[in-house]
């Protein structure tokens, strides 16, 4: 990966890394994608 909330220095962040947070919940990287599941920027 090159960009995305679950990418750091062209490598995937580990599964379970917080990729975005709201006041009521957190969403976590899967370790298999540079995109965050349910990330608002995903369209």
Swiss-Prot record:
CC terms in the record's Gene Ontology section: extracellular region
UniProt tissue specificity: Expressed by the venom gland.
Keywords associated with the record: Angiogenesis, Cell adhesion impairing toxin, Developmental protein, Differentiation, Disulfide bond, Secreted, Toxin
Disulfide links within the chain: 1-10, 6-29, 7-34, 19-36
Function: Specifically interacts with the alpha-1/beta-1 integrin (ITGA1/ITGB1). Exhibits highly inhibitory effects on cell adhesion and cell migration to collagens I and IV. Also shows in vivo anti-angiogenic activity.
Localization, UniProt: Secreted
Sequence motif: Cell attachment site, positions: 21-23
Subunit structure: Monomer.
Family named by the database record: Belongs to the disintegrin family. Short disintegrin subfamily.
GO MF annotations in UniProt: toxin activity
Name of the protein in question: Disintegrin CV
Main location: secreted
Every Disintegrin domain range: 1-43
Any one GO biological process: cell differentiation
